């Protein structure tokens, strides 16, 4: 079982006791449906054959990065779950470019 704790620094906790921290995201992720988007992204990555740890860490990072991209264009206060989904492609592109 992997446990994901979202906060200023999100933590992905593994069954072996390892913890991976991610600092992407903002307060906009408190919006309704953001956790569902994260779950869907992780499930999609698992469906593509990623290992559980990779899917969890990458999913947390992509959703957090999507929230940051949104806040850079608009305001994190107006972030919606749909906005996160709409920016996932941009987040993935930015991640691949770096």
Q: Where are these predicted regions, by residue range?
A:
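Small-residue (G/A/S/T)-rich helix-start motifs and N-terminal tracts that mark the onset
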Residues: 1-98
